[in-house]
Design a protein with these regions (language model features):
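Second-shell loop/turn segments in exported
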Residues: 18-25, 42-51, 81, 106-109, ...
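Structural recognition of the beta-strand scaffold that forms the well-ordered cores
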Residues: 36-39, 121, 139-143, 172-177, ...
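Extracellular/luminal Protease-associated
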Residues: 101-203, 207, 254
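Bacterial Sec-dependent N-terminal signal peptides
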Residues: 1-19
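N-terminal hydrophobic or amphipathic helices/low-complexity stretches enriched
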Residues: 15-74, 130, 187, 262-264
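Noncatalytic luminal/extracellular "stalk/propeptide" segments of secretory-pathway proteins
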Residues: 44-139, 146-148
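Metal-dependent peptidase/peptidase-like ectodomains
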Residues: 210-211, 219, 312, 321-373
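Soluble metallo-hydrolase cores and metallopeptidase-like ectodomains found primarily
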Residues: 18-19, 99-102, 106-132, 198-289, ...
């Protein structure tokens, strides 16, 4: 943290040594207090959408205001509201293919559906496989992944492209038969059974049905490949959608150079974490998120405090993102709905998962692409 703050301040007061900068501008106890508060049990792991994350957002906004940072959010506030929705996991998935009944399912993309009709088996489901038969409006069954997939993870990773391919052919849904690696299966089942949070879908477009069915020895895949025809009954039920909003926290300081102050350097971090989960060996179920990412958040607060005292030629934009642990949601929404023109951003210092052993290095990516230095 100290190294990053020193680097940031070095842009404006390069004449001072690093040691002088640290001793004159950084108060260790202040940084510690930010981290201890944000990572406290009282904030319950700062889950996106929780009341505790709202408390964290207010804490950040109040400190930016205290330092003299100007609000850059909505209606003169420090808040940049991010519209979100959580789609619950289904209460039930049942699937019957001819006389085969599935027992293990991962619903990676699902909607409530009751399908009775024809299914088609397409081996691994390559584009050539889809082009061989009429699949429109039918349920498509494939082996998971592609011929190059060697484990469950690689098979799941290949599924996204296959899902988009299936959608382009107008199929009713995609079922992939997958050999179960129990540890990996439990890991993904836990993730998908919690429901999925994403940016609010303003068009209310229906989700495409994409489900993995456990097939331990791939015997079902063999049966499907040998079947002359396949009748399918797929039922997915109990899915509910909850809409809510969460907050990015944004503020800015104006630069000192008349020619450069219209350009911005961003100092950012995400301030959310994963909330409450499975207890550890000490029966502690709160995932406090000190390293991920109370430390990074404290870095931005400290940079804001000091840059308010020692402003740079370019303007400074401070962004604390929500929803990172849910899939970079706050930063994605900000990129699509910026408070300042993106073409005026010349560099971004983002701090995430700091506090590891080596405190002597700060790595800068893309320095050759900017005029910030």
């Amino acid at each position: 943290i100290i190294s990053l703050i020193t680097l940031c301040l070095g842009l404006s007061i390069q004449a001072q040594s690093n040691a002088e900068l640290v001793s004159s501008t950084v108060v260790k106890s202040d940084i510690e207090s930010h981290i201890y508060f944000l990572a406290s049990d009282e904030l319950k792991g700062r889950q996106t959408g929780s009341d505790e994350l709202k408390i964290a957002a207010a804490y950040l906004a109040n400190h930016l205001r205290k330092y003299g940072v100007k609000p850059a959010g909505e209606n003169g506030s420090f808040y940049h509201n991010v519209p979100l929705e959580t789609v619950s996991a289904p209460s039930n998935i049942s699937l019957k293919l001819n006389d085969i009944t599935g027992a293990q399912f991962l619903g990676v993309s699902v909607k409530n559906i009751d399908y009775d009709g024809e299914a088609v088996f397409l081996d691994f489901g390559s584009k050539e496989d889809f082009e061989k038969v009429d699949v429109k409006g039918k349920l498509v069954i494939t082996k998971a992944g592609n011929p190059e997939s060697t484990n469950m993870m690689s098979k799941l990773m290949a599924g996204r492209a296959k899902r988009e391919l299936a959608k382009s052919f107008g199929v009713a849904g995609l079922i992939e038969l997958i050999e179960v690696e129990q540890n990996m299966w439990e890991r993904f089942a836990h993730y998908f059974n919690e429901g999925q949070t994403g940016l609010k879908n303003p068009e209310k477009t229906e989700k495409f049905v994409h489900i993995y069915m456990g097939d331990p020895a791939m015997t079902n895949a063999v049966s499907m490949a040998n079947a002359k025809s396949i009748t399918a009954n797929l039922k997915v039920e109990g899915i509910e959608t909850k809409e809510f909003s969460s907050r990015n926290v944004v503020g800015y300081l104006e630069g000192t150079d008349p020619k450069l102050k219209d350009e911005f350097i961003i100092y950012s971090a995400h301030y959310d974490h994963v909330g409450i989960g499975k207890p550890n060996a000490e029966n502690d179920s709160i995932y406090n998120g000190a390293r991920d990412n109370a430390i990074g958040t404290a870095t931005v607060l400290s940079a804001a405090e000091n840059l308010a005292k020692y402003p740079t030629k370019r303007s400074s934009l401070f962004i604390l993102f929500t929803g990172e642990e849910k899939g970079l949601l706050g930063s994605k929404y900000y990129a699509e709905n910026p408070v300042m023109p993106l073409n005026k951003m010349v560099y971004c210092f983002n701090s995430d998962n700091g506090g590891y052993n080596d405190t002597s290095k700060v790595t800068i990516f893309g320095l050759h692409r900017t005029t910030v230095a």
